[in-house]
C-alpha cells in the first residue's frame, strides 16, 4: 500500500490497508509466499509542504506566536511534537534562517516522524510491512533513468510533443514542449503519457514506472492497492509494467485493486473533523473507540471498489443487522454451548444427524473452495461474505431449537446425538476461526 507521509492515517487509508493485509493473509493461507510492501511517496511537492508546516511548529516550540496556520500548510496538532523535537535538536539555529538552509533537513526529519506515526497507526490494526520503499531513494539511485532507458530500447518511450488539452481552450501560458512520452496508446490509452515534466522532474507516472521496474525484478506477481481516485492511471501503469516485464523475458502478472473512501457517520450523521489531524478523523481515533477487529471486519463487508459508510453506533450494535456482531455471536454461542454441554463432541455417530444439520455441514464444507476462489480472484471480501452466510445458517439452526426442543444441540436424554451435534457445532466454530484468521480478526469465545 501507499499513502503520502504527511500526517496520520485516516479511514480512507485504513480501508486500503485492511484490504491489502487481508489479501496477503488470504494468499498465504492458499500457499503463496507474500511480501507486504509500503511505498513511501516522499519525493513530491507535498513533502516540501510538510517541511514548511513543521518549520511553523518548530518556531512555535521556540516560543513564537505563529497565529493561524496559513492556508496551504498542514494545520493538524500532530505536527506540534515534531516541532518540539526539532527545537530540542537544533535550538533556534533555523528559526530565522532562509528556507534553502533548512528545507531538505526538515523534509527528512518530518518524513521520518510521519512514518513512525504511520507504522504505529498500522500496528493498531495488526498490520506490519516487510519492506518500506522510498520514492526519494529510488530517484537518488537513478531508478527512473534505468526504467526510461529500458523502455526507450524497446521503442516504448520517445521524445514528442503533447497535443493541447481537448474540450476546452488551453491555458494562456500553454505552449508545446517536447517531452519523453510513453506509448500508452498502444495499450488502449487515449494518448501517450509523459514520464517527465517540462522542468525535468519526474511525473507521478514516471516515478511509478521506476518503482515497478525495481519491484518486478524480485517478484512472480505484483498487486497494488490504490485509492479509487487513481482509477484513470491503472490502464497505463499496467501497460508499462507489462512492457517492462515482458521486455526482461519475465511476464509478471500485475493487478491493481481500487479502494473507495469511507464515509464516517455517527447515528447517521456525518462525523466532524478531528482536532488532531485538522481535517479528518484519524485511524487511531476510530480503533480506540470501536476496536481493531470491528474496524478490520467492517472494512471487508463490501467490495473494496464500492462506496462504504462506517457508522460508529451501528458497528458496535448488538444486532443481527451488524455483521461483525452476528458472526462473533455465532462463534461465542458455540463455545458457550460446548462449555455447558457436559458431553464431549464426538464423530462416532454422525449418521444421527438429520437434514437440517447436513444443510449446515454443506454450508461449512464450502470453505476450502471459497478460499481457493477468493485467492484466485484476489478478493478477500469473499471470505467475509461466506462467514456471514455461515453465521446466518448456524443461527437459523440454533433458532430451530427454540421452536422445536428436539432440534436443540444438547439433548440430555440422548448423549450420542448431543455429541454428534456438538461435533458439528465445533467444526462450524473452527471454520469461523479459520476464516477470521485469514482476515486478521480474532474470534471471541465470550460476549
Regions found by a protein language model. Give the residues of each.
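Non-catalytic interaction-recognition regions
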Residues: 1-447
Amino acid at each position: 500500500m501507499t499513502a503520502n507521509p504527511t500526517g496520520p492515517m485516516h479511514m480512507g487509508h485504513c480501508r486500503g490497508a485492511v484490504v491489502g493485509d487481508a489479501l496477503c493473509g488470504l494468499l498465504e493461507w492458499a500457499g503463496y509466499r507474500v511480501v507486504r510492501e509500503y511505498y513511501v511517496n516522499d519525493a513530491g511537492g507535498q513533502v516540501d509542504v510538510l517541511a514548511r508546516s513543521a518549520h511553523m511548529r518548530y518556531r512555535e516550540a521556540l516560543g513564537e506566536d505563529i497565529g493561524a496556520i496559513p492556508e496551504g500548510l498542514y494545520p493538524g496538532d500532530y505536527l506540534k511534537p515534531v516541532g518540539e523535537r526539532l527545537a530540542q535538536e537544533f535550538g533556534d539555529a533555523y528559526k530565522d534562517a532562509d528556507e534553502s538552509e533548512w528545507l531538505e533537513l526538515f523534509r527528512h526529519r518530518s518524513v521520518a516522524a510521519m512514518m513512525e506515526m504511520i507504522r504505529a497507526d498500522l500496528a493498531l490494526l495488526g498490520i506490519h510491512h516487510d519492506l518500506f520503499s522510498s520514492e526519494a531513494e529510488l530517484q537518488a539511485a537513478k531508478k527512473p533513468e534505468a526504467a526510461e532507458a529500458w523502455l526507450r530500447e524497446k521503442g516504448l518511450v520517445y521524445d514528442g510533443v503533447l497535443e493541447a488539452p481537448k474540450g476546452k481552450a488551453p491555458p494562456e501560458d500553454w505552449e508545446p514542449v517536447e517531452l519523453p512520452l510513453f506509448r500508452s496508446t498502444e495499450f488502449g490509452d487515449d494518448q501517450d503519457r509523459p514520464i517527465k515534466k517540462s522542468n525535468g522532474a519526474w511525473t507521478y507516472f514516471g516515478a511509478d514506472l521506476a518503482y515497478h521496474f525495481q519491484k518486478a525484478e524480485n517478484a512472480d506477481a505484483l498487486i497494488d492497492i490504490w485509492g479509487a481516485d487513481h482509477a484513470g492511471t491503472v490502464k497505463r501503469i499496467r501497460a508499462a509494467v507489462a512492457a517492462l516485464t515482458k521486455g526482461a523475458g519475465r511476464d509478471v502478472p500485475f493487478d491493481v485493486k481500487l479502494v473507495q473512501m469511507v464515509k464516517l457517520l455517527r447515528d447517521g450523521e456525518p462525523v466532524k473533523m478531528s482536532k488532531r489531524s485538522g481535517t479528518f478523523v484519524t485511524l487511531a481515533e476510530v480503533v480506540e473507540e470501536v476496536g481493531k477487529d470491528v474496524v478490520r471486519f467492517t472494512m471487508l463487508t463490501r467490495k473494496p471498489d464500492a462506496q462504504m459508510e462506517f457508522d460508529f453506533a451501528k458497528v458496535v450494535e448488538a444486532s443481527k443487522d451488524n455483521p461483525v456482531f452476528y458472526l462473533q455471536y455465532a462463534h461465542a454461542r458455540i463455545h458457550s454451548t460446548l462449555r455447558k454441554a457436559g458431553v464431549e463432541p464426538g464423530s462416532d455417530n454422525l449418521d444421527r444427524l438429520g437434514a437440517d444439520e447436513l444443510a449446515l455441514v454443506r454450508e461449512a464444507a464450502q470453505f476450502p473452495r471459497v478460499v481457493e476462489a477468493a485467492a484466485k480472484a484476489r478478493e478477500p471480501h469473499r471470505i467475509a461474505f461466506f462467514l456471514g452466510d455461515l453465521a446466518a445458517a448456524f443461527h437459523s439452526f440454533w433458532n430451530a431449537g427454540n421452536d422445536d426442543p428436539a432440534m436443540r444441540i444438547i439433548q440430555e436424554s440422548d448423549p450420542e446425538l448431543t455429541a454428534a451435534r456438538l461435533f458439528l457445532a465445533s467444526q462450524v466454530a473452527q471454520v469461523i476461526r479459520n476464516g477470521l484468521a485469514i482476515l486478521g480478526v480474532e474470534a471471541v469465545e465470550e460476549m
